[in-house]
Amino acid sequence: SSVGSVLKSKVVCYNFGEAGAEQTDKQVGTEEYEDSVIPEIYFMDESVSVAVGDHSFAVYEGGQVPVKKREIQVGQEIRSSFHTEKYIGFVLLNQEKSGYEVRLYNKAGKQVMNRAFTGEYSNVQMVGDEIIMYEGSACCIITKAGVPRFKGDLKIDALLMVPAAGFNKYLVMSTNELRAIYLAK
């Protein structure tokens, strides 16, 4: 919403069980964010959830009544986000030099990895210990420690890419096939 010329986003937590039974409209929590858009909210597990803004994110804890535990200002524009049960990750527009930056945080909101990279990838996911980024046939894989594993051309336009059993083996799904590939540096 916008009040005057100030942009505001509101995160509302509902509980349709016993904890929300006595609350108006089952609302058990509300948090307003000024001058920020919150386009994504997800659960990492049954008691930790994350609200992602355009320049920050907030970690909430509590299964029945989520409470904001910390809010982290990222300091750069968040282009995309990804997560696992252990990590919160972002692709950021790198303001210091051309290109982008991938940044990884643990559930507590502590930064654990930061790595600059070039290229634009609209698909970003974390599977196991790897951050897999791809767009068309271009691909970049970085480990959770920030070590580049692969950057190159897959020779197939990927709609989905996941690790498979075997060393450097991945399954790549395109519009008309599922292909097993082995990546070499």
Go through the PLM ranges and name each one.
Residues S1-S5, V11, E40-G53, F57-V59, ...:
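Short beta-strand elements that form the blades of beta-propeller/WD-repeat-like
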Residues V28-E46, Q73-E85, A116-D129, I156-K169:
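Repeated scaffold domains used in trafficking and secretory/extracellular systems
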Residues V6-Y33, G53-V74, E96-F117, A138-K155, ...:
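Surface-exposed loop/turn elements that mediate protein-protein interactions on large endomembrane-trafficking
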Residues G63-V65, Q76-S80, Y87-V91:
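C-terminal amphipathic alpha-helical segment
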